[in-house]
Amino acid sequence: MIQIIPAIDIIDGKCVRLTQGDYNQKKEYHSNPVEVAKMFEDAGIQRLHLVDLDGAKKKQIVNYKVLENITAATKLSVDFGGGLQSDEDLKIAFDAGARQITAGSIAVKNPEKVQHWLTQFGKECIILGADTKSGMIAVHGWQETSDLSIQQLMNQFIPFGISYSICTDVAKDGLLQGPSFDLYKQLNEEFKQINWIASGGVAELADIEKLNDMGIYGVIVGKAFYEGRITLQQLAQFNA
């Protein structure tokens, strides 16, 4: 059964969503992320994708207190991302209670660093953030596009045991038009050793059911939940 992973994106300590990664298209949903996390846990959900959007912009961890407060108040298994660049950033995140971290831009800019993290912290703790824009990897909160394809990116980390990857199609994110099913099908067939987590575009329950039928490991649900298109009860049925 597919893993349901709700997303909480943080700016100024508050729960927000961006459209297509654009900081100018920001909508605030809740002033207290801990309450949102508790709501997920109360519904039977076990995981959380927590993104420090301030950190992604500043290229260093910013909202670690929110992470700390969520892991203190819930038993959710949290993966944390956004601007993680250094060993010290990872230490802060893990000390604050993160079960996993997502390495995004740093995997493109400094692959040796992420290879080192896989060796040092173990493959269960590191998720590769593969954000694609027209087939190429987007970095720094999707403000820039690199000259790497997703296949080239993955091949840099497979020898180091990478097991988890969140793949976001930036063109789909926040638009509620459905995920990039063809992309996930291709990646799932091409890289069978990777637990793929689909992100971006989920608009209704049928999208999650289709990803589940395709054998995708996990799905991140954001705007569809916050806009009331998918209920907590519907999400929780996958964890039954």
Swiss-Prot record:
A biological process term (GO) from this entry: L-histidine biosynthetic process
Enzyme category, top tier: isomerase
Disulfide bridge positions per record: none
Gene3D superfamilies per record: Aldolase class I
InterPro entries membership: Aldolase_TIM, His_biosynth, HisA_bact_arch, Isoase_HisA-like, Isoase_HisA-like_bact, RibuloseP-bd_barrel
Pfam families xrefs: His_biosynth (PF00977)
EC annotation from Swiss-Prot or TrEMBL: 5.3.1.16
Protein family (similarity comment): Belongs to the HisA/HisF family.
Name the record gives this protein: 1-(5-phosphoribosyl)-5-[(5-phosphoribosylamino)methylideneamino] imidazole-4-carboxamide isomerase
Species annotation: Cytophaga hutchinsonii (strain ATCC 33406 / DSM 1761 / CIP 103989 / NBRC 15051 / NCIMB 9469 / D465)
